[in-house]
């Protein structure tokens, strides 16, 4: 007869014995997240479940798949989000970018476009924190749009989702005039792959991460074109900490925009705000 899980204690004991690939605080974290996001839903309406139902989840973790993908959920800005293969797992640095926007525009009613939304964390948090803002989100990946729409429903916020390629000319006609544009674009150079974790390289979508070495500003230039076309007066961008000089040279050549760089909590230059210069 198969071993069964019927409560938290039986789950904890089984996981402790089976999950030899993690230890210490990380193991405690894995146990809690999997209990909440995997085991509890499987137990609904049942007295117990076979451990055979849980073996595939542990096998995915043994292969190095990120916990957020295996559990199907992560938190961003204290808010739950569904994630899975096909969307980037949101990072804490992006929370700081969102916080900057909220800090700068606390008393305004804005129309906002997020470019490259992925799982939708940026537009959803902005809309949740500022319900009177009109928020649009543009994403090229159909799988990402599907997950983002689910997250909008999960968090009960209306977002205008746009399935569009940033580099397609139609992108400029899909969205009305915007006050503010935000983006966390691909910015990691191919030559920086050695800095990435094996888990990230093997499982997260590389199209959301990497840009060619010879043109690291590719997405930033295109986003700026959209900002100009949408007559946006403010632009917030997440940055590659290793490209500060390249960004500084780029903004020095921009006409009509003033730039402000900001460091993250680790002291790394990770954010940029561009504002239309006033006469």
Label the model's feature ranges.
Residues 213-274:
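Conserved Class I SAM-dependent methyltransferase catalytic core
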Residues 187-218:
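Mobile active-site "lid"/loop adjacent to the S-adenosyl-L-methionine
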């Amino acid at each position: 007869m198969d071993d069964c899980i019927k409560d938290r204690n039986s789950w904890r004991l089984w996981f402790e014995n089976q999950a030899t690939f993690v230890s210490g605080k990380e193991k405690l974290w894995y146990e809690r997240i999997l209990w909440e996001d995997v085991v509890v839903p499987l137990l609904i309406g049942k007295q117990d479940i076979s451990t055979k139902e849980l073996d595939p989840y542990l096998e995915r973790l043994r292969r190095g798949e990120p916990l957020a993908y295996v559990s199907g959920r992560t938190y961003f800005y204290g808010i739950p989000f569904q994630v899975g293969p096909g969307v980037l797992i949101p990072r804490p640095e992006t929370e700081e970018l969102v916080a900057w926007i909220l800090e700068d525009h606390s008393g305004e009613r804005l129309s906002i476009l997020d470019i490259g939304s992925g799982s939708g964390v940026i537009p959803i948090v902005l809309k949740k924190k500022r319900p009177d803002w009109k928020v649009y989100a543009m994403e090229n990946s159909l799988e990402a749009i599907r997950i983002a729409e689910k997250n909008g429903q999960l968090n009960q916020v209306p977002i205008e989702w746009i399935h569009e390629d940033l580099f397609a000319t139609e992108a400029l006609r899909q969205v009305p005039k915007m006050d503010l544009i935000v983006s966390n674009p691909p910015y990691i150079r191919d030559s920086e792959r050695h800095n990435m974790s094996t888990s990230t390289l093997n499982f997260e979508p590389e199209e959301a991460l990497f840009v060619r070495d010879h043109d690291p500003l590719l997405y930033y230039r295109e986003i700026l074109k959209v900002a100009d076309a949408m007559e946006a007066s403010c632009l917030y961008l997440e940055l590659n900490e290793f490209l500060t000089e390249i960004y500084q040279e780029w903004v020095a050549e921009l006409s009509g925009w003033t730039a402000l760089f900001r460091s993250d909590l680790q002291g790394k230059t990770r954010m940029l705000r561009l504002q239309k210069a006033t006469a």
